[in-house]
């Protein structure tokens, strides 16, 4: 063999060998990058799981009002709220499991079917078994969600053997409350201005001048409507969020257990209703039956004739 040809052959062989080494190195580097990406992604997944499933942790909001950095819902108080939180936890676990499975499949597909691993991609157009699976499984998941969802919906909608009725009327931008079972007195509830709230140590944008007062251990019917535009009476601790619609009556119910006597629960209007929508807080104070009866006696004197026209002056008969 000519020396020059032999040298060329050796160089070509060396180049091929180097090409194989470079190809293997690139593949290893790609694998390493994927592994590093997964390792970097793993703490994020753990953090997401902690956030999603941490609804029973120590960062839960205090009873009746939101707290800074809270996770999950406020502590449930009413029977509807307890069932609602169970449903919320079920949905959280389902969403977490589905998200993890989809993400794992996505990472697997990115690695297993990359261009380097599959220079000639598959031309498969359909897969009967796979199509049946990804049709049936979502249907089953929806059924798992629908059954407790409808149970909760009808449980919140039923009003049986109500001990007390509270009428709620939304107005721009305050609430009016009526107590038809206790003399039919009426009063308005407006937000305390921010300067006064800060000066007196009250909850800014949450405390009101006349809170709703409700007795504990009583089934309470809530009837809502509006005097102008659509409002929404939302009370997270009681799991109530119901529209107040002009010309229509919406109804729900609640029950506050006895251990919450003395607690004030806060909520807000949750339907955009105009320029001062953010200044329509709701405050509900739970009291014992004895305290409620004493408050009713006082409220009847204070509010019973508040909306009646002034008496007409007449001339003396003498």
Question: Language-model segments: which ranges?
Answer:
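Hydrophobic alpha-helical transmembrane segments of multi-pass integral membrane proteins
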Residues: 46, 50, 92-108, 135-148
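Non-transmembrane, membrane-proximal soluble domains of secreted or membrane proteins
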Residues: 62-90, 111-318
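N-terminal secretory/membrane targeting signals
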Residues: 2, 6-16, 21-62
